[in-house]
Amino acid sequence: MISRIRKGRNNKVFLFKKKKEKMIIKEYKSNFSTEYSRFLTEKIFLEFLKKKKINNVPKIIFFDEKKKIIYLTFIDGKPIRRVQKNHLISCLKFLKKINFKTTYNNFKFQNASDACLSIDDHIKTCQVRISKLFKKHKNNNKIDKKILSFLKIEITPSFEKINIEVNKKFSKAKMKKKLNKNSLILSPSDFGFHNIIYNKNKLFFIDFEYAGWDDPLKIICDFFLNPDYTISRADKKFFLNKFIHIFGKKLLNADNLRLILKFHFLKWVCVILNQLDMEISKKNANLTYFKKAVNYFNKNKKILE
């Protein structure tokens, strides 16, 4: 028996059941515009994790490169509802294992999807999403008017204010300067508790189709800001201190975290708003996503101070 358990823009995920046997079938869409192949990214990254003897991830059973399908071991468990320190420690251990004796030279892998290799990249990942939302919501229907109003009143002025701040602090040359390859870390990219399964006091990590080399600060920003879960202020401080202890030598832009975090906060508001396109025929779903974006912004806008 095969049943679909997830439908998204980038892939379809199915659960295969036969008596006591279970496996995950992941089918990657080939017509979705992207710089990298999500199928190859996940396949290569899972093979890399296997070589590193990292076992708390799915294992490849079979793959079909032509059809862009991977059969994976099924991981039983449940999502984490409340983030605790022991969960954060497990996340840190996972990142440390991935990067232990791993360098850009001995693992010639691609950059992560939306990798940020300069201060300018962090700014653009937000700016591009804002621009795309303005272009997508030009219609005069009720939801488009709400989105455009929200973008004009809250998001754009916030972005412009941070942009002024960052331009005062850095020269254009400094903003465009790329990080040295040795300053990057290997990132699962879409890393957070939305992609973690909890089973028998152990965390299992899934979904590596965006993985690659990235600025360590981007991992921190996305891990802290993902709207699907909440990490307390104290736990964020705990995680950050431990992260710096592990990757300290690579955190060349650590003093810039406060500014960079602001751009990624606005980016995440845009990410939520962009989900409206996936449910464009369902007015109630669209309204739900819009409310989620507004609530997320209002709840966390102290970040912009």
Per-segment meaning from a language model:
Residues R4, F14-K138:
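ATP-binding pocket architecture of kinase catalytic cores
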Residues I5-K20, I24-I25, I164-I219:
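Active-site acidic catalytic loop and adjacent metal/ATP-binding pocket
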Residues G77, L203, A211-W213, N226-Y229:
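Activation segment
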Residues T103-S189:
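An alpha-helical support segment within catalytic cores of ATP-dependent transferases
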Residues K161, V166-K172, K200-K202, K237-N256:
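Short amphipathic alpha-helical segments and their helix-coil junctions
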Residues P216-K249, K262-S281:
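Active-site activation/catalytic loop segments of kinase-like enzymes and analogous catalytic loops
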Residues C270-E305:
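ATP/Mg2+ or Mg2+-diphosphate-binding catalytic cores
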